């Protein structure tokens, strides 16, 4: 007979479940603003802005100063370590700004990917060392949930069984550690869109990966009601010549989830995976309109697909801040509708909303 040591108390479980429910309340999703310094550098470079701490702070401020229209759209914001301790121009901590809106604070806790020996260029995610101590500190500093990202690619030889198993175990250990400190773990096993594979192949690999993840979660005694899943939508590879409808993407995605994700999981918060803002919203709405039974909240945890138009509008200029914030609010409202299956094509995807955000081997 196996047991969890130390076991979570009834009070701990209640807190974790309530946090998870709050994040994915109807119509709400997650703003992923946890890009690393290097990833922010790539974004800022695209608009000709220097990558320094002040410019990173200014852009995060554009997002965080959104008015109360986002209160019913955003249930959680994922911070990067640097951002957790930054303030607005007025000296108000970003954490306080977000919490005052009734939005839950999250924190990225992984330390990035490293090569996995014995594989054909595959990776595992590091950061378990010292994670318990970091979680304890982040909880004191206002964070109630965390995110950990593992990455896999589809090719003729990948993902290998070794890669899938190793990353599943790492995700489960991370989740267990978080829960001991009252932090809801977001489990993110991302399958990259790199390659020319079709929809069926992506669905098969997604099912393999998610099945392994939840086997590991069970083995590590993770309390599923106090977790969220952040998977890729099931989409064809970026180089696939076949184009699929949003309804086909939705059916493949929901089918994969139904075959692998226990109903006890509180919510599924999809990553955008390099899709354009508009494409991600359309697919999310289609997923929520899929006629199959869906026992979880199905919503968004978008980074680029919430920020691209705002970033393009801002361009590092003070006079553009208000307009950039409006662009962010617009995307938040659209994705709120999409998470309820109520969004239809807006008709204009010629600007930033229609631009693909695909980057080969994308890393945060």
Curated annotation (Swiss-Prot):
**CC terms in the record's Gene Ontology section:** cytosol
Matching entries from InterPro entries are given as: Aldolase_I_AS (IPR029768), Aldolase_TIM (IPR013785), FBA_I (IPR000741)
Looking at the keywords, is DNA-binding present? Answer: no
The organism's place on the tree of life at top rank? Eukaryota
**Listed Gene3D superfamilies:** Aldolase class I
Record-annotated residues binding substrate? 56, 147
**Record GO terms (molecular function):** fructose-bisphosphate aldolase activity
User: What EC number(s) would the UniProt record show?
Assistant: 4.1.2.13
Q: Which residues form the active site?
A: 188, 230
Entry's family note: Belongs to the class I fructose-bisphosphate aldolase family.
Q: How does it assemble?
A: Homotetramer.
Query: Under which name does UniProt file this protein?
Result: Fructose-bisphosphate aldolase C-A
In which organism is this protein found? Danio rerio
């Amino acid at each position: 007979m196996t047991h969890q040591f130390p076991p979570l108390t009834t009070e701990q479980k209640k807190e974790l479940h309530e946090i998870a429910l709050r994040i994915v309340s109807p119509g709400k999703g997650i703003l992923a603003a946890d890009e690393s310094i290097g990833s922010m550098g790539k974004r800022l470079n695209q608009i000709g802005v220097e990558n320094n701490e002040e410019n990173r702070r200014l852009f995060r401020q554009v997002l965080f100063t959104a008015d109360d229209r986002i209160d019913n759209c955003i249930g959680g914001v994922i911070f990067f370590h640097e951002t957790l301790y930054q303030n607005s121009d007025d000296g108000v901590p970003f954490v306080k700004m977000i919490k005052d809106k009734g939005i839950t604070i999250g924190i990225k806790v992984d330390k990035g990917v490293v090569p996995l020996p014995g594989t054909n260029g595959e990776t595992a995610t590091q950061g378990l060392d010292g994670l318990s101590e970091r979680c304890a500190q982040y909880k004191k500093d206002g964070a109630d949930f965390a995110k950990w990202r593992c990455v896999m690619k589809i090719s003729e030889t990948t993902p290998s069984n070794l890669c899938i198993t190793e990353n599943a175990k790492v995700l489960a250990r991370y989740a267990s550690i978080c829960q001991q400190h009252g932090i809801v773990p977001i489990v993110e096993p991302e399958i990259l869109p790199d390659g020319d594979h079709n929809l069926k192949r992506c669905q098969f690999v997604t099912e393999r990966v998610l099945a392994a993840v939840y086997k590991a979660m069970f083995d590590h005694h993770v309390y599923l009601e106090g977790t969220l899943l952040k998977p890729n939508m099931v989409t064809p590879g970026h180089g696939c010549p076949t184009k699929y409808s949003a309804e086909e993407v939705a059916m493949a995605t929901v089918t994969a989830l139904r075959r692998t994700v226990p109903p006890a999981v509180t919510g599924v918060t999809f990553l955008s995976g390099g899709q354009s803002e508009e494409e991600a919203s359309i697919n999310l709405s289609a997923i929520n309109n899929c006629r199959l039974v869906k026992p979880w909240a199905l919503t968004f945890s978008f980074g680029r697909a919430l920020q691209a138009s705002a970033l393009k509008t801002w361009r590092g200029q003070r006079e553009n801040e208000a307009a950039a914030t409006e662009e962010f609010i617009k995307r938040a409202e659209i994705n709120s509708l999409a998470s309820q299956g109520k969004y239809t094509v807006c008709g204009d995807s010629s600007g930033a909303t229609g631009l693909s955000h695909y980057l080969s081997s994308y890393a945060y």
